[in-house]
Amino acid sequence: MQTHIARTLHDEHLATLALLARLETLLGRHAPTAGPDATSPAVAALLRDLGRAVAQEIGPHFAFEETELFPRLIDAGAGEMVALLVEEHAELLALAQELAALAAPARTGGFAPEAWARFHAAGAALTGALAAHVDKEEMGLLPAIDDLLDAETDSALAMILAQQR
């Protein structure tokens, strides 16, 4: 990755994949019918981190791409890729927000059986779909950004990104 923007998005992808790995571990240890102790330090930290990630990382990451990068990519002829990524963003953000909404009450009251079953299903759907999305962006979007952005535009976008974080 040559541009600051591509490197920053790559780093955000790595952080997202690390969070997804923690979520997958939790889901793998507990069947949909037998939820975890939400007061255990690891589970409590994951539930907190999920809410924070949706509000402060995933949503803003998608918004930055859609407002600052995708119009430039469309102008450069990458409209099909952009259309696919925008569609995935909408689906992924809805899943992530659902998961965060299910995690919030569990942080203080634990998981009721039906709430855990819904959390488990939403978590499983999100981990698979978001990991596949990250792969697409790593293989298609980031190289396209490197090819598209000159140093001046990269610097200007880096300033915008820093202000949004």
Predicted regions and their residues:
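Small-residue-biased structural context
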Residues: 1-165
